[in-house]
Amino acid sequence: MASLIYRQLLTNSYSVDLHDEIEQIGSEKTQNVTINPGPFAQTRYAPVNWGHGEINDSTTVEPILDGPYQSTTFTPPNGYWILINSNTNGVVYESTNNSDFWTAVVAIEPHVNPVDRQYTIFGESKQFNVSNDSNKWKFLEMFRSSSQNDFYNRRTLTSDTRLVGILKYGGRVWTFHGETPRATTNGSSTANLNNISITIHSEFYIIPRSQESKCNEYINNGLPPIQNTRNVVPLPLSSRSIQYKRAQVNEDIIVSKTSLWKEMQYNRDIIIRFKFGNSIVKMGGLGYKWSEISYKVANYQYNYLRDGEQVTAHTTCSVNGVNNFSYNGGSLPTDFGISRYEVIKENSYVYVDYWDDSKAFRNMVYVRSLAANLNSVKCTGGSYAFSIPVGAWPIMNGGAVSLHFAGVTLSTQFTDFVSLNSLRFRFSLTVDEPPFSILRTRTVNLYGLPAANPNNGNEYYEISGRFSLISLVSTNDDYQTPIMNSVTVRQDLERQLTDLREEFNSLSQEIAMAQLIDLALLPLDMFSMFSGIKSTIDLTKSMATSVMKKFRKSKLATSISEMTNSLSDAASSASRNVSIRSNLSAISNWTNVSNDVSNVTNSLNDISTQTSTISKKLRLKEMITQTEGMSFDDISAAVLKTKIDMSTQIGKNTLPDIVTEASEKFIPKRSYRILKDDEVMEINTEGKFFAYKINTFDEVPFDVNKFAELVTDSPVISAIIDFKTLKNLNDNYGITRTEALNLIKSNPNMLRNFINQNNPIIRNRIEQLILQCKL
């Protein structure tokens, strides 16, 4: 039958030549792969060896341990620890602001009996009585608050590392005291912190306060071994003062130059304007259901002034890592519902590809030292009213995210006429106020930005910032480096797909019932499915190859692959156990369906939720245990074939995406049934479940345990004519037991007979299935 086409795609039976593989790899790297290469990026290798040139980087990386520096007198900055490495007994340092703070630290070697010693402090000779009965060095902190007062020992540090620290911060002077390895800090307040200077008599280091834990570690445990070698030579403190040359915002600098090539550094300030694209697809039927609200790629072109120069810019905005939400207002055809709507949140990313007509982008082929800095922007969602035929319209309203710059790399933008080498700016997201809601529904106070109206009536969102890069260009300024992608002009594939989806959805009304049933019964293969596009066999095979490669990554192919792995695991586990049957029922061959059912409680809501999940998985079992009846995939493939033949826009580039989307999105509302004697058990993707007798169509209680047993061993049948349609048909026309059984089994001949008789109930059911074949 027609669903054979899906099984053929799943078997990956078509060979792929090397040219196709190379073409696919190049395409994937250009379109789908985003990397963050750090400070170096290139699209092609350069034709000559690069010189190192001048590397300008505005990022200051502050070392944890800066030094050692020679002894000196200076005013230390606030917020930095001065770590002094004492190498002799005597005065280690003196510090004062000449108003309310005088302090000096003297070092006492181990094993010193009480003795009077003379020290020269602040130009004065002072005598202190000192002693040290321990095996470690002692550092006495002598302090006075006025030039008229005497010094006294305020704190003592006992240390085997011989390191002393002092910090100016928060209106206080902080030092270490106690005994290593458990020395701690304490502070002394002063009214004139900024004017405190220090005279250091030993070599010292500078550590930022943000690394105070490291300073504490050094005080208590000693410096790293590399600092204790004779190869480390103290430098004068003046070597720490570097004259920084700040680059202009917009300038071109020659970094290095040879006879044919030169490296140019381009510094640019930029204004990025972008907008989100979206697609809203309404389902067929009575007009109360929406199938998809999704983000799409959006291009935007604009002009702005940069240093008095008019700049023409082009941006492409896309999103990654979207979150899928849904809303189901009920099971009736007049109940409002959205099968899937996309929301971007904290786990999502926004990509903006930027190009302008300046020299920086003219030769953007060989690039290094790429860096950027951009502001953040808040994007707030607007309102979208769902125009249902009767009743108050539900309105999706609100939602907001903030975009924060997270990286930049090279990219290529595809426009209708040319491909542009661009910069791709990546933004991470944080959710913001307000939350979004769907008025007149239960969906309230959810955070993120939904795809319904992400631009909120704004023509664009705007971000300002700057970037810098070094590009290898020709010495001849009139020469433009060839760009590989500019050899061929490529139409925007996403735009083609959007137009094709609209055409496909509009063709649903033109499909004849009899033609559909006949086509669904044919064993469609690759050639017959795609031969309607072009007559040549070679092109058809090439198309089939492209479709197969794209189809590999579809949800259906992935699910089949996972199911195969489960089968393999179940078989290997069963072979090691005595009870094969019990083991196979525990590890079922469509990802534990029987377990899901058997774990269901007697609660109606729980059964509804579980059966909805299970019914979506039963499609996989039906595909590997084909029955004589017609399946939903037969109808799906037949509709796909019909629309391909009728389409005027289908082509080699768009066909793989359309076939893959059709396998995932055609007929989202499916029902499956299992027969046992004269009883039928039926479940659907909306969570409804029925059990009824074949003869009378009278409902009987739905036995969950019985269903769990049957679903493991019995064949699964697509409920083309579902229970509601069967009951309606029997009540209005009356059908025999044989007709009922054939309709229950989805017998194609019986379906064709009812279609030929122009039965309105059966015809309406098939029409509804065709209308569900939307993209």
UniProtKB/Swiss-Prot annotation:
One of its GO terms (cellular component) is host cell rough endoplasmic reticulum. Residues 388-408 are annotated as: Hydrophobic. Pfam families: Rota_VP4_MID, VP4_haemagglut, VP4_helical. Residues 65-223 are annotated as: Spike head. Keywords: Capsid protein, Coiled coil, Disulfide bond, Hemagglutinin, Host cell membrane, Host cytoplasm, Host cytoskeleton, Host endoplasmic reticulum, Host membrane, Host-virus interaction, Membrane, Outer capsid protein, Viral attachment to host cell, Viral penetration into host cytoplasm, Viral penetration via permeabilization of host membrane, Virion, Virus entry into host cell. The keyword Membrane applies. Disulfide bonds join 317-379. A motif (DGE motif) lies at residues 307-309. The keyword Nuclease does not apply. A motif (KID motif) lies at residues 643-645. The record marks 230-231, 240-241, 246-247 as: Cleavage. Residues 483-517 form a coiled coil. A motif (YGL motif) lies at residues 447-449. This strain probably does not use sialic acid to attach to the host cell. This is Outer capsid protein VP4. It comes from Rotavirus A (strain RVA/Human/United States/D/1974/G1P1A[8]) (RV-A).
